[in-house]
UniProtKB/Swiss-Prot annotation:
Topology term for the membrane: Single-pass membrane protein
Main location: membrane
Keywords: Membrane, Transmembrane, Transmembrane helix
Transmembrane stretches, start-end: 26-46
GO cellular component, as recorded: membrane
Subcellular location: Membrane
Protein name: Small integral membrane protein 42
Length: 70
């Protein structure tokens, strides 16, 4: 049995030189990666903000700890 042929790696030298020499291809790549990086950055920021808020909620207030009611 023969194994099926695997496709060539996407970013070989030919593809990279085509992307650099062809401005339309370069613009398409930029329009793809710009929203992707924006989305990743926003997700990281939201994660950090929600993580910080959850840590603040877990901290106990010093006056509440010191107050003992019989």
């Amino acid at each position: 049995m023969s194994s099926p042929q695997l496709p060539a790696f996407l970013w070989d030298k030919g593809t990279l030189t085509t992307a650099i020499s062809n401005p339309a291809c370069l613009v398409n790549v930029l329009f793809f990666f710009t929203p992707l990086m924006t989305l990743v950055t926003l997700l990281i920021l939201v994660w950090k903000v929600t993580k910080d808020k959850s840590n603040k909620n877990r901290e106990t207030h010093p006056r509440k700890e010191a107050t003992w009611l019989p």
